[in-house]
Amino acid sequence: MGFLWTGSWILVLVLNSGPIQAFPKPEGSQDKSLHNRELSAERPLNEQIAEAEADKIKKAFPSESKPSESNYSSVDNLNLLRAITEKETVEKERQSIRSPPFDNQLNVEDADSTKNRKLIDEYDSTKSGLDHKFQDDPDGLHQLDGTPLTAEDIVHKIATRIYEENDRGVFDKIVSKLLNLGLITESQAHTLEDEVAEALQKLISKEANNYEETLDKPTSRTENQDGKIPEKVTPVAAVQDGFTNRENDETVSNTLTLSNGLERRTNPHREDDFEELQYFPNFYALLTSIDSEKEAKEKETLITIMKTLIDFVKMMVKYGTISPEEGVSYLENLDETIALQTKNKLEKNTTDSKSKLFPAPPEKSQEETDSTKEEAAKMEKEYGSLKDSTKDDNSNLGGKTDEATGKTEAYLEAIRKNIEWLKKHNKKGNKEDYDLSKMRDFINQQADAYVEKGILDKEEANAIKRIYSSL
């Protein structure tokens, strides 16, 4: 038994001492640090880069390596890597020492507005407004100080440029640039187009109003070549001279120098503008019939209004607000409506002037006097019939008057029956749905609007109002 216990203890001692002899210790402290560093997962990045570069150098130049290099120990390789790493670290430190002052210098120069080369061109008042002040902003979407414009300012600026340059391509260029940069979407581009079109119409109306105000003021247009005092030319005199002496006198068109694009488009004094109105037969016939000096002012106003409306329709067609067919239809209605309204307005004066052309001379016989009176009465009757016709003033006035009256009575009778049916069948319904007082006010407003547009005569409108007021 004692022998067995002694043998078991010897076996335990052998097992405990075996693992210690199986794993030898490192020979030196340097090998131990290298061993620990290789086992570590957090090696410095610089060492990894240097080691990779050293491997590349060895692979690229295998023939230049000496036979003794294969006998180098890991300690020599580590020293080589350390030398390369230290060299790279020193170079990076030198670059970092040099770079901060340079960066600071650039920042100081950027912040210093006096060193900006673009300021000379920006504040040069001799340059045109189309020479854009920012190289990265060729469409001029910045203010003078460089701050971005608001949405309303951009819309107004685009509309102004389209009006000044008379070119739709300006809008397309700006929108395509904004779309390419991703600043707006397709829907926003359509919205912007509507807003620009609205702003352009307001701008045209504003310029037209300003131009009409300047027509009332006499202005000195030119100066004689001999150095004389400039002549005062009023718009009325210019129109009269241009219409009566178009073949012989060309000084009027030469003296009327226009300053902006709107005046070039709406100037009634030019000969070619007056000839353009020949394409509107009703209006042109009305103009040629106005010859008296008292109606010269009326004639000038009519030409200005008609030219402004024609150019406005052209602009709407050009920029896609309305179709060309709608523009032609609108111009045809415009020609007929303005001519008819003006003729009705001047009817009283025209009748008086015509009646004065047929007085009863004292030296004529009684029969001749009676025939003259009959002719004058006929003319008054014909001109009076124009009040009852709003559709066609070139056809037989008597027949058209009867037809217009019959249509009016039938129309009024239909209104009367419609209202009676509403009163009869709406006893249980909501009274507010067919409130006659509200309907009466609405009909009165519509009738007045139709009178202003020339759709109804004043007598027809009054008849409609009486029917609704009697219910």
Curated annotation (Swiss-Prot):
> How does this protein sit in the membrane?
Peripheral membrane protein
Sites of Phosphoserine modification: 40, 365
Write down the InterPro entries for this protein, in alphabetical order. SCG3
The main location is: cytoplasm
Sorted UniProt keywords: Cleavage on pair of basic residues, Cytoplasmic vesicle, Glycoprotein, Membrane, Phosphoprotein, Proteoglycan, Secreted, Signal
Free-text tissue specificity from the UniProt record: Expressed in various brain areas, with highest levels in the arcuate nucleus and the lateral hypothalamic area, as well as the paraventricular nucleus and the ventromedial hypothalamus (at protein level).
Biased composition range(s): Basic and acidic residues = 28-45, 345-355, 364-404
Note one Pfam family from the annotation.
Answer: SGIII
Quick one: signal sequence residues? 1-22
Kindly list the places in or outside the cell where this protein is found, as annotated in its UniProt entry.
Cytoplasmic vesicle, Secretory vesicle; Cytoplasmic vesicle, Secretory vesicle membrane; Secreted
Instruction: Give any Gene Ontology cellular component.
Output: secretory granule membrane
What are the start and end residues of every segment in region (Disordered)? 24-45, 89-108, 345-404
Attached carbohydrates are found at 40
**Phosphoprotein in keyword set:** yes
What quaternary structure, including any partners, is listed in this protein's UniProt entry?
Interacts with CHGA. Interacts with secretogranin II/SCG2. Interacts (via C-terminus) with CPE.
General function of this protein: Member of the granin protein family that regulates the biogenesis of secretory granules. Acts as a sorting receptor for intragranular proteins including chromogranin A/CHGA. May also play a role in angiogenesis. Promotes endothelial proliferation, migration and tube formation through MEK/ERK signaling pathway.
Which PANTHER family does UniProt cross-reference here?
A: SECRETOGRANIN III (PTHR17388), SECRETOGRANIN-3 (PTHR17388:SF2)
Query: What is the protein name stated in its UniProt record?
Result: Secretogranin-3
Species this chain originates from: Mus musculus
This chain is encoded by the gene named: Scg3
